[in-house]
Amino acid sequence: MKKIILLIFLTLNLIALTTNPMIKIPQANSCNIEDNCIDFSRKYSDDEYKRLFGIYKSECEVKNLDACIYLAEFYKSGLGVKKDAKKSIEILNKACDESNKFACHNLGVEYQEMKDHKMALAAFKKGCDLAFIQSCFNVAVLYNNGGGVKRDYKKAAKIYKEVCEQNFYEGCYNLAVLYHNTPGVKRDYKEAIKLYKKACDSDFSISCYNLATLYQEQKEYEKANKLYFKACKLDFADACNNLASLYDDALGVEKDDEVAFRYYNKACRLDSASGCKHLAYFYYHGIGTKKDKKLAEKELKKACKLGLKEACEIVRDFH
C-alpha cells in the first residue's frame, strides 16, 4: 500500500492570490479615523454598522482614503448599507487613482474574485508600483498562471525573487516550486533547496514540507524526517501523514508502529484523508493501538468525506 504523499506541485497547490481580509484593509495602526477603526474579525450590531457607515462615507467625501477603503468594504459586504459591488469598485478606483496602495490592492482582489484577471493584474501592478509587496506577489502569481496575461515564468520568477529578498516567504516558496518541479522550467534543486529552507526557517510550513519531499526523493530520509516533524508541529497535515509513513515503513528510522499511529492520528485530526485512511487500517488490524473496528469504520468514513474515493469503496465493503 503506497503511503507517501507526493510533492505538492505548483499547478495543484500554488499559494493563492493574496485575499486575506487582514491584507484587504488598512492595519489598525494605519487607520486615521480616531475611535472608529473597525475590526473586521468582530461582529457588530446593525446599528453600529450603520453608524460607522455614515462616518466612513462622510470622511471619504473629504478624501480620507483610509475611510474610503473601509467604505468600499462596507458596500461590498453589505454592512450598514445594501450590498453594491459596483459602488465598492468605484470607490476603490478613485482611491487607487490617488495613489493609495491599499485601495489598488483591494481593487485587484475584488477583480480577481470576479474572475476579471486582466483588470486584477492592472490594479495589482499599480499596488506594486506603490511598493505594496502583496500586490507584487499577486502580479507574479498572475504571470505564473497566465491570468490576464500570457503565462511568463521568467517574469514571475523575477518578481518572486524580489519579494523573497524582502522576506515575503510566499514568494520564496513559489520560486522554489518553479525550480523544483514545474513543466517548462529548468530544474535547479540547489536553488530550490535554498529557497525552501529560507521560508522554512521562518516557520512557513508548506515550504518545510516540500523541502522534506525533495530530500525524500533523493532518499535522504533523516533530513526528510526532521523537516516533516517541523511541518507537522506547525500543523501541516500532509507532513504528519508522511512522517507517520517513514516510521511505518522504516525509512531512515527504526520501524515504530506506535509513533506511526500517533502521527497518522494527528494527520487525520488535521483533515488529511490519507492520514484517516491509514489510521483506520491501524485500528482495524490493531497496529500500534488496540484493535477497534468501530473506530476504523469512523476514520474511513471521514477519509471518504474528505474526498478519498478509495476510502469510500472500502467503507461500502467494510462489513
Report each predicted region and the residues it spans.
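N-terminal leader/linker segments that initiate helical-solenoid repeat arrays
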Residues: 17-55, 59-62
